[in-house]
């Protein structure tokens, strides 16, 4: 598995005083899905082992970590529909907890969570949920995906309901850093990144499953995907850690290109499009402070002028 590192973070060009916080070393594991569950877990565990061996404090895994990307098909058309799992007792948490304990790191993962609808009923849907497991194997935080795609090849509305609006932007503290745990399609919405930044997020982790467009086979969205995430990093003074998957599943070709970007829009580390990789980078956490002091986006906002953002329809 290819290892790509970015240590000794670049200087913060807006810095006027020494940093108050130590850098945080994070990792993103880019992997393909393996049909054999044991082989798949072993491949992911090897990525976690490599990252931990490089001193990563947090290791981030792709969307629907242990699963194929089953939303490439509508549920009614799927030959073997995936079943949601219990967050606390299911295989994803068990895997992440075992990896966290074995390697003494925080492990971030993603799962199809079994949970009742907000009204207590059964709507046939679950949540697309990101979790962070602490080194002692306990759940540090969980976040349900807020925005759900519904386009060809990404029929997530057939499988997942939207995450609750009143619990959309929780943070978790890792050492001196505040992390947010949104998921994939959330990365296209500037409102979400802004809400997390206002809450004090230093780092957003976006587990991702994105690749080709079945209805537009000649359209490569990878450059746009990276640009929008990078733009949101700059506009909100947050680091972005983005683990995507690679490989082909049911005609969908995932384009990898996992990356880690800083609040100045500088890509610290990037994976190739077509092979597994582990990215490990040091994040200068106070680059956020420096950039917001020079360009105070958060304190010069005009919420009184933003009514169209909350209009429906």
Describe each region flagged by the PLM.
Residues 109-111, 128-132, 170, 258-260, ...:
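Short beta-strand scaffold segments in enzyme catalytic cores
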Residues 3-10, 85-87, 115-203, 207-228, ...:
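Active-site catalytic loop in hydrolytic enzyme cores
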Residues 85-108, 178, 184-277:
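CN hydrolase (nitrilase-like) catalytic-core segments centered on the catalytic cysteine
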Residues 2-14, 231, 239-313:
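C-terminal beta-strand edge segments of enzyme domains
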Residues 19-32:
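Short beta-strand segments enriched in small/hydrophobic residues
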Residues 37, 45-135, 142, 210-231, ...:
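Cys-nucleophile CN-hydrolase/nitrilase-fold catalytic domain and related Cys-dependent amidase chemistry
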Residues 11-16, 42-59, 191-198:
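Short amphipathic alpha-helices and their capping/turn segments at secondary-structure boundaries
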Residues 26, 132-141, 261-269:
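Short, glycine-anchored, charge-dense loop/turn motifs used at functional sites
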């Amino acid at each position: 598995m290819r290892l790509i590192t970015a240590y000794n973070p670049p200087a913060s060009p807006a810095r006027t005083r020494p940093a108050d916080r130590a850098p945080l070393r994070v990792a993103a594991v880019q992997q393909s899905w393996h049909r054999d569950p044991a082989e798949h877990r072993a491949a992911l565990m090897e990525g976690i082992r490599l990252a931990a061996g490089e001193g990563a404090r947090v290791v981030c895994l792709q969307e629907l970590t242990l699963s194929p990307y089953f939303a490439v098909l509508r549920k009614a058309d799927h030959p073997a529909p995936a079943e949601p799992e219990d967050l606390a007792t299911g295989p994803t948490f068990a895997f992440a907890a075992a990896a966290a304990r074995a390697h003494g790191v925080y492990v971030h993962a993603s799962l199809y969570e079994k949970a009742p609808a907000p009204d207590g009923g059964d709507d046939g849907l679950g949540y697309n949920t990101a979790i962070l497991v602490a080194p002692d194997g306990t759940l540090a935080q969980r976040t349900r995906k807020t925005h759900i795609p519904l386009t060809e090849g990404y029929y997530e509305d057939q499988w997942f309901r939207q995450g609750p609006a009143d619990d959309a932007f929780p943070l978790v503290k890792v050492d001196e850093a505040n992390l947010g745990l949104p998921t994939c399609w959330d990365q296209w919405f500037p409102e979400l990144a802004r809400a997390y930044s206002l809450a004090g997020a230093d780092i957003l982790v976006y587990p991702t499953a994105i690749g080709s467009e079945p209805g537009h086979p000649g359209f490569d969205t990878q450059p746009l995907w990276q640009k929008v995430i990078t733009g949101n990093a700059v506009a909100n003074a947050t680091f972005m850690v983005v683990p995507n998957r690679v490989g082909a599943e049911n005609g969908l070709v995932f384009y990898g290109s996992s990356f880690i970007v800083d609040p100045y829009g500088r890509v610290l580390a990037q994976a190739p499009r077509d092979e597994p990789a582990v990215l490990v980078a040091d994040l200068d956490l106070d680059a956020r402070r420096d950039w917001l002091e020079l360009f105070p986006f958060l304190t010069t906002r005009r919420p009184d002028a933003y009514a169209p953002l909350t209009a429906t329809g």
